[in-house]
Amino acid sequence: GRIQNIVKNHNGPSGNDICEMIVSIADRLSAGDREQHKTKEDKEISSSVMQLISVFCDINLNKQNKKFEETYYKRPIKRDVLHYAEKETSPRIKEEYEKLFESLKEAFNKIYSEYGEDKFLFAHYLYHLIENYTFNIPSAYYYNRPTISLWAHLKTTAAIALALYNQLKVEYPGEGESENRIKRQLETIINKLNDSSTITENEFPYFTLIKGDISGIQDFVYDTDMDGASNALKGKSFYISFLMETIAKF
């Protein structure tokens, strides 16, 4: 179907389908935060590992020691399974990815059969399903150092695509000639991305990044009686996370 074509052509639209063009642009903008390999050896190691590198190995408190050991999330697992990063890589990573994908398909079919008729509920469950299954695997490893999860890349790609679509529909309302103008504008953006040196500041003012900072909450979190402290801390942590998600959504 159309969704399959949009996903399949996310690296480059096959024609002038608006959604394909928007997702392709969003994918490229979202991938702009990937860290390039520093050496040829790093690239060769990363291409064979295919696992997400823990960002904690980049934390260097001793400025004299520039060398750090990379640690990997050894198995691609679901979010509800606790697993720490390790120095050794998994020798059966391809098989583990296949198992994870089969489990994802099974879970997807289940939520689709239960909530497929309600688009809002289905989108809600699909969002968390994808997070659950992709938070621990790299978005790319062939050409980039795999420190960005597939979940983070997918989420920002979707956010950029939706923002771009909504903004263009406001600028060019209606159908017919308006859609043709949208296509021409998207073609211009794609051509500019192919040669980023031609992009000027504020040339495409379509996005606003809003940063939220919840600080000074230590008193709220730790002002807890010792009796039942564990449950209270979990509850307050959930409340803060839920509050941030709600503010960001609305």
Stretches with model-predicted labels:
Residues 1-4, 11-250:
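Regulatory and interdomain segments flanking nucleotide-handling catalytic cores
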